[in-house]
Swiss-Prot record:
Summary of the function given for this chain in its UniProt record: Ferredoxins are iron-sulfur proteins that transfer electrons in a wide variety of metabolic reactions.
A Pfam short name: Fer4_13
Reported cofactor(s): [4Fe-4S] cluster; [3Fe-4S] cluster
Gene3D superfamilies from the UniProt entry: 3.30.70.20
Tagged with keyword 4Fe-4S: yes
Keyword Zinc among record annotations: no
Organism taxonomic ancestry: Archaea, Methanobacteriati, Methanobacteriota, Thermococci, Thermococcales
Residues covered by the 4Fe-4S ferredoxin-type domain: 3-31
Protein name: Ferredoxin
Gene behind the chain: fdxA
Length: 63
């Protein structure tokens, strides 16, 4: 199943756990916030990263 990945940069606190858990999907931007590097993914790590985000800034929707 493919997932559409988004990060609410207003909510993101720059913890970087998502980029550590799933570097193929998330990267840290120059603004210190997480940003998806792909629009959709089927990687399980994206869900793991969303669950690990301490502020719930990551949203996954069925693509």
């Amino acid at each position: 199943m493919a997932w559409k990945v988004s990060v609410d940069v207003d909510t993101c606190i720059g913890d970087a756990i998502c980029a550590s858990l799933c570097p193929d999907v998330f990267e840290m931007g120059d603004d210190g916030k997480a940003h998806p590097v792909v629009e959709t993914t089927d990687l399980d790590c994206a869900q793991e990263a969303a669950e690990a985000c301490p502020v719930g800034a990551i949203t996954l929707e069925e693509a």
